[in-house]
């Protein structure tokens, strides 16, 4: 399941409550073509990797979170463990997304 993040507080809360689990954050926008293309794959990964926390941040709805995380383009995927960023890449690259998850779990 992918959790939709709608505030800076909800983002921090989600990172904190994840504990030891890997957190994957998809920074996207409704008007972004590549974001729409990879979204179903991101959701399917959330079903496949039940021990990983998947979050989705709409950069237009949560500009403060996107700014704090220094997101420059969409889609950007960031990976967190114990509240610390441990990885990041931009672009709708399905293979890289799944490979990065496997590398970090």
From Swiss-Prot:
PROSITE patterns: THIOREDOXIN_1, THIOREDOXIN_2
Modified residues (S-nitrosocysteine): 62, 69, 73
Disulfide cysteine pairs (residue numbers): 32-35
Subunit structure: Homodimer; disulfide-linked. Interacts with TXNIP through the redox-active site. Interacts with MAP3K5 and CASP3. Interacts with APEX1; the interaction stimulates the FOS/JUN AP-1 DNA-binding activity in a redox-dependent manner.
The protein's role, per its UniProt record: Participates in various redox reactions through the reversible oxidation of its active center dithiol to a disulfide and catalyzes dithiol-disulfide exchange reactions. Plays a role in the reversible S-nitrosylation of cysteine residues in target proteins, and thereby contributes to the response to intracellular nitric oxide. Nitrosylates the active site Cys of CASP3 in response to nitric oxide (NO), and thereby inhibits caspase-3 activity.
Family according to the record: Belongs to the thioredoxin family.
Protein name per the record: Thioredoxin
Source organism of the structure: Sus scrofa (Pig)
């Amino acid at each position: 399941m992918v959790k939709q993040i709608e505030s800076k507080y909800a983002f921090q809360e989600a990172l904190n409550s994840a504990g030891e689990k890997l957190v994957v954050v998809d920074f996207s926008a409704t008007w972004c073509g590549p974001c729409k293309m990879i979204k179903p794959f991101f959701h399917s990964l959330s079903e496949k990797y039940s021990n990983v926390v998947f979050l989705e941040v709409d950069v237009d709805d949560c500009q403060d979170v996107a700014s704090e995380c220094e997101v420059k383009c969409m889609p950007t995927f960031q990976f967190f463990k114990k509240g610390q960023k441990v990885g990041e890449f931009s672009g709708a690259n399905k293979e890289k997304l799944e490979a990065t998850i496997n590398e970090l779990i």
